[in-house]
Amino acid sequence: MSTSLFANVEMAPRDPILGLTEAYNAEKNPAKVNLGVGVYFGDDGKIPLLAAVKQAEQARLAAQPPRGYQPIEGTPAYNGAVQGLLFGKESDIVGSGRAATFQCLGGTGALRVGADYLKALLPGSTVYISDPSWENHRQLFEAVGFKVDTYAYYDPATRGVNFAAMKASLAAMPPKSIVLLHACCHNPTGADLTAAQWLSLIHI
């Protein structure tokens, strides 16, 4: 009788966020609210199909593009459109070739690819995540061997960003530090920087 190679593999701990969803599904209270996974639900409790997504799906289906392998960086036209959306079509960042864009498998997958790349470039650096942050971010960067620390971000008293403390934290970091910023929909607080604060941050 052979023993399975996986016989002694221990079960990983259950994901706490997905566990909240399981508890939500089991809850009988009709007024319950799901504050677990960061997914938008309509008033009917269902995930809506956004009109823009439906339109994009229909346009792609109508065009019937080839189904071969994509270039390593992904679809060039899509990457260019993303750069134009983020930086502006006439941005010098785009025009001078300083923006690099490639497609990845979702948000966490993209972070892992970035973490591996940064580990090869800056192996001795520390990664800084916001306080608080989504805990998976810490685990992801620690898994590739980075030391992970935090920078000041949220102020519970104002329920917003403590921008002065955040700027002080960033200014005190050593050279070649790696800072993980949430561009929007900060996880888990929902507190985002204003356009003026982003511009101020660029100069640190």
Residue ranges of model-derived segments:
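Short loop/turn segments at strand-loop or loop-helix junctions that form parts
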Residues: 36-39, 179-185
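N-terminal small-domain helix-loop-helix segment of the aminotransferase-like
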Residues: 13-106
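Conserved small/polar residues in nucleotide/adenosyl-binding loops
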Residues: 202-204
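Charged helix-capping and loop-helix junction motifs
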Residues: 193-199
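Generic N-terminal amphipathic, Lys/Arg-enriched alpha-helix
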Residues: 2-8
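PLP-dependent aminotransferase-like
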Residues: 92-104, 109-112, 116-181, 188, ...
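Well-ordered alpha-helical segments embedded in enzymatic catalytic cores
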Residues: 19, 81, 110-114, 165, ...
